[in-house]
Amino acid sequence: MFPPDVNAVFDHGKRAVSSFPIATGSYYKWDYSAGVDISRYANIPVPTSYMAINSKYDFVGGYEEHIKSGLLHVADHHVNAGKKQWTWGNGDFGQAWDRNLTDEDGPYIELMTGMYCDNQPDFTWLQPYEEKSWVQYFMPYQEVGMVKNATRDALINMESAGEGKVKVALYMTSTHKQVRVLLTAGECVCLDKLVSVSPANPYVDVVDCNASPDLDGLELTVFGEDGKVLVGYRNAPEEIKPLPEAAKAAKLPKDIAHIEQLFLTGQHLEQYRHATYSAMDYYMEALSRDEGDIRCNNAVGLLLMRKGKFADAQPYFERAIKTQTERNPNPYDGEPHYNLGWCLKMQGDNDRAYDAFYKSTWNAAWQDAGYFGLAQIDMLRGDYEKGLEHIERSLIRNWHNHKGRQLKATFLRKLGAFDEAEKLIADSLKIDLFNMGCRFEAYLLKSARGMEQDAVNVKAELKEMMRGAVHAYLEYAIDYAAAGLYEEASALLQFVVEDNERTYPMVYYALGYFSSLAGDEVAAKRYYVKAESMSPEYCFPNKLEEVLMLNDAMRVNPDGAKAFYYLGNFWYNARQYKDAIACWEASVEKDDTYPTALRNLALGYYNKQKDTGKALAALEKAFALDMTDARILMELDQLYKKLKYPHRQRLEMLERHAELVEQRDDLCIERITLYNQLGEYERAYDLINSRKFHPWEGGEGKVTGQYLFCRMELAKKALEEQRFGDAVRLLKETEKYPENLGEGKLTTAEENDVHYYLGCAYEGLGDTERACRYFSAATRGSDEPAIAFFYNDQQPDKIFYQGLAWRKLGDEAKARSCFNKLVKHGEKHLFDNVKIDYFAVSLPDLLIWDDDLNVRNKVHCNLVMGLGYLGLGDKAKAKRFISEVVNLDINHQVAVAHLAMCD
């Protein structure tokens, strides 16, 4: 339920657009050209997502007619621009997901709202130490129906009741004894009434006011007891609004004419966290044309900083500043100076960082962050009075810098101004009750004042509120360490260790690093050795400061294997693949008994170095070290699949580890697939029937594909043996998927092959009428070939069966048209350079090992050419092309199944 001024909706990334609420075009591959109200769940047969264009109303919600109840979200539309719904669709496919995702197997609808964003994905920016805040209300309501306007106090609706009458409905979130409900039509008052309303007793009335069906000119207003307007709505005359344009894919860097557009495109890719396009490519193209460009140098520096490459980032900030100050030593924008200060500070060059931070404060926009950076270095130097002055300047510019509030309290404590510090902490906790830095500072203050019991109480409350969240402890400890407060940082982390000595490894790396910075390398090594003995499970360093910690650990304790492993994880996530592989190799060299380091190396070798031999050796060793890890077994089998290992060999391995296979749906499906590929369809049939499957995103269509394949092949076998009744039974089993598959059939499912073989079966039974009906059904659908990337894309063999069906119906011209289209499509696109669609929100499969899309395209083109020639009766050419498919991909079931038809 979107506000009444929403006339259009966008898909993810604004890649597609539809009119709303009445859709009149194609959306999510479904034809709504008849005019369909897509605001109603019942009218959406396929998985569908849509997001409202900008609205001037402050609400979004949903309403269930049959129980006359709904859910509403209210927030200021100036910051809450995003209004979205997602459904799996009111079809067999969606209803299967209803069973998977809801407690009582009811319809599953996601309502989402976006703060400071209007689409998914659409991220806004957070500047250093910036706070973004908002207020939002979620509320249930009843009786009102499709809300026309809402505030936190009241919801209203008015709609035609026929014969000039208007239904008026009001729901209020609290009890009101006398609210005034006013309904007017121009100068005419249709209703003016004082009513008592509460959440349990909404007000609903039908008013006769000679209204037109579209309620033109009607205005409904609700006044509180004090006469203030609580909510109102004026029905606007219907007007034709232009549909907004869908977004366009970014051009390649070389195709963009202007440096500004290169910068803006790169910035967009960063902001949207684009999965396949790199912002760096656009910035570097710009710098290849103008190496001094301020914006692109600054952007490259920031990108490198976020990847932990501090030294690499420095020259880009310096180049940006050089350009800025060529004519004027006082630039308009202080950001490059601030970023240079941050970069230098992360490298330990505090003197030069101090100068850069100070220069950034010459610009008002960077004073809060710049003065905060200065105050941190002042604290590190022990210059408390100057630091207090700087942090106060920072807070003047950003009163809600919660890190700054903690740092000011620390300065006051260091200067002995305990009362002032405690007052600041109390004031800060009124702003943010969960400012744990201030709470820890309160503990330190109580301890410094000798108030031991109070300190114990503050500590207990802090630990209770922190809930053992080790990453939060690390964040606050890093804040202290960034200001040179290594003793305090270590004391905070001791709160974690005293509760559980066997804790997250990075706690001990942090303690070691703080000791090292404080000049105690003996203690540092002790902590680093301790960190090595902690469980590595779920340890994925992601903070920039953790790069410094792990580098120091590798220096102080060079024999520690895990520090290299953890840093490798960071580098791989930061797409610094060469560094990641080098770290993992060093880790394995020091300790070759940890399976995950070997597994990670296998990923790096295969996906980034294209070294299949080293990848295979590493992954096989990883599995040999831990034969209880079902995940590694799955990945090893997928690698064998990539390397074209024989089906029987792969199946034998899975059967040897049957207990592991049973732990994972993906392994079970792979086992079933192998039985199908080996022609053991009855075994595949039994395995599918014996398990309850749970679908996953990226795995759609996997188990249902094997369910269809084994029944199809068994039916074809029955047809060959003239067991036409058995063939009908098997093919009829594909009409509705059993619930144990966990997945339903898409409303858009193309079933030309099923219908064709049903026609053949009924033809064999002598039922000409049914045979013709199924042959006719088999001719339906698009006859334009296209490569199938996603589970809901049409598979190319469906067109082949359209052609066979036309032939059965005696229309050879249409049959040959289908087959020729397949051949021509393959010839035209065989040498295409294929890329993932710019707007793709997911990959077509849950890929572990990189896929070559150009090889996939060759597979597709050879297949369609082979099928085309098979239909045209040229079996020699058909066999040549389909054999090439099998040569490229021995696991291509469709190709293997049709290769037999070429003999």
Task: Indicate where each model-derived feature is located.
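Long, contiguous interaction/recruitment modules in multidomain scaffold/adaptor proteins
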Residues: 149-257, 436-438, 452, 513, ...
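Residue-level recognition of tetratricopeptide repeat
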Residues: 267-268, 302, 342, 376, ...
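A contiguous, surface-exposed recognition patch within enzymatic or periplasmic domains that forms
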Residues: 2-131, 139
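Single-residue signature of alpha-solenoid repeat helices
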Residues: 279, 313, 353, 387, ...
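Short coil turns that delineate tetratricopeptide repeat
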Residues: 291, 325, 331, 365, ...
